[in-house]
Each structure stands twice: as structure tokens, then as C-alpha cells.
């Protein structure tokens, strides 16, 4: 006789506040998990980049070298390097251990909104209000980009790299997907200025948020709209969106002090997580666990799917 299949467990959503970190670096413009989720990066309006332990909420290192507020950052897969970008028009490559600037790259004509390593951390990609994405070789000493992508009609607000693909979101209302290996470009017209883009974890879809207070899920290869998610407020700020670690839910920051969770398939609002009374500007989802980082004003919140003492007892 056949045993009935076990029912799949309902996905766990981070909704229990584990800790709040007072970052003491002005407004936190972006918060990011590192590649393995053990550390977090905060980008401050006071020109600093900070590295923290997620489990303890303790400050490990401060990186100083930008001339104006830091807007985005990323960590290399082996945790040896960081990259960051700033309103000072520069991109900086950092040595994690020493805290020293390895390279400071100039070339953008305006503030740099977003930066990310490729998978091997051999290339940094930066997107700017000047409408270009610049690709920088992290291993060479040359100060010029190895490639400039200038198809956007307005500023680049967000970019994500996955293997040989690059996804960009622009104020011109378009999501662009570059196949860097094949030299191909696919453009999806959304219409409203894009604030954030990302790939789904399975690589089949793209997610974008825009200033019409809507998050959209598109089929990556066809551009077909698979889902629209709304209810949050995104009218004046560059806010983050993302998918959970298992692609079951769509998340977005909101200007009303909440993080919104929608069921990816149903499109229905699953959870409206109260963070505080101000704008939730940035979020980051753990690569493998149901954990979430949010930033509001000068603080970062770490959220888990269950109360922290219960999680510690299990581990």
C-alpha cells in the first residue's frame, strides 16, 4: 500500500523581530546580506560602509573612503572583498580584512545608485543616474571600465547580476535584460520609473517595483506578465523588492512603515509586517533561511520566522 505524500509545509515568513541595530551612520540607505548570510552591510548617509555580525548585531568594521553618502554595496562570494557606490560618483573596491581601499573608480557623470559583483567577483557592475552601467575588472589595475552599457534613456536605479545575465531597472520605465555572453538585449516596458529589479531564485522570472506602487513579476524569456502585487506605497522613494529564499512570496518595502508579503502565485497579501513609523527604505532576504533585514532611518531590523530563542533551541 502506498503511503500518502506528506503535505508540504507552509513556508515560514520572517515576522518576529530578533534585534534592532542602531547603526550610527546617519540614514541607512541600503542594507545587504553577504553571500552566506552570516554578515550584513549597511550603507550610511554619513559616507561610511559598515560590516556587522547578523547573529550578534555587533559592528565588525567600518569602511571610510567615500566623499558623500553610500547608496549600495555588495560582498564577494569568498567574503574577501566588498564593493560600494556613492553619491560622490565613485565605486570603491575594499579589502574586507584590512578595511583599506583597494581601488577607487571614477567615470560616472552622476551619483552611482547600485553596484554588484558578478559571481566570481572578477567584475563589478555599477549603475548611475547618468544612465550608464559600467563594468570594471577587479583584477586589473586599469581605471577604465571594460564595458559601458548606455541603452537607458534615463538614470539606472537598480541592477542585478546572475551568471552571464544582467538585469537593470531605469527611471525611463524599462527593465532591460542583457545576455552578456551572447551580446543580446531584451527590453520590457513597464511605464513607471523602476525603483528595484531582481531575478527569481529559480532564474525563470524577473521582479520589478516602480513608482506607481506596483510590483510586477515577468516571465524572463517572454516578458509575459505573471503577477501584479499592490497595496503598499511607493511614490517618491527608491525602495527595494525581492523574493523569499524559496520563491514562494514577493516582498516590498513601503513608505507607510511596513513590509508587504504577497503570495507569488495567488497575488494575495499574506502579511503586512509593521516595522515602524517612517519609510522602510531597504530590505534583504537571507540566501537560504527565512530571515529578513530591513532598514528604517538610522536603524536596521533583523527578522526571523520564529522567536529567536526558539530558533536557538533548534540549532
From Swiss-Prot:
UniProt entry keywords in alphabetical sequence: Cytoplasm, Repeat, WD repeat
> Gene3D superfamilies, per this entry?
YVTN repeat-like/Quinoprotein amine dehydrogenase
Q: GO CC: one term?
A: cytoplasm
S-S bridge residues: none
Keyword Iron-sulfur in the entry? The reply is no
Pfam families membership: WD40 (PF00400)
> InterPro entries per the record?
G-protein_beta_WD-40_rep, WD40/YVTN_repeat-like_dom_sf, WD40_repeat_CS, WD40_repeat_dom_sf, WD40_rpt, WD_repeat_MORG1
| BP-aspect Gene Ontology terms | mRNA splicing, via spliceosome
Q: Where do the WD repeats start and stop?
A: 23-62, 65-104, 107-146, 151-188, 189-228, 233-272, 275-313
Task: Assign the protein's first listed, main location to one coarse class.
Answer: cytoplasm
Where does it localize?
A: Cytoplasm
Give the top-rank taxon of the lineage listed in the UniProt record for this protein: Eukaryota
Family from the record: Belongs to the WD repeat MORG1 family.
Question: What is the purpose of this protein?
Answer: Molecular scaffold protein for various multimeric protein complexes. Acts as a module in the assembly of a multicomponent scaffold for the ERK pathway, linking ERK responses to specific agonists. Also involved in response to hypoxia by acting as a negative regulator of HIF1A/HIF-1-alpha.
What's this protein's name?
Answer: WD repeat domain-containing protein 83
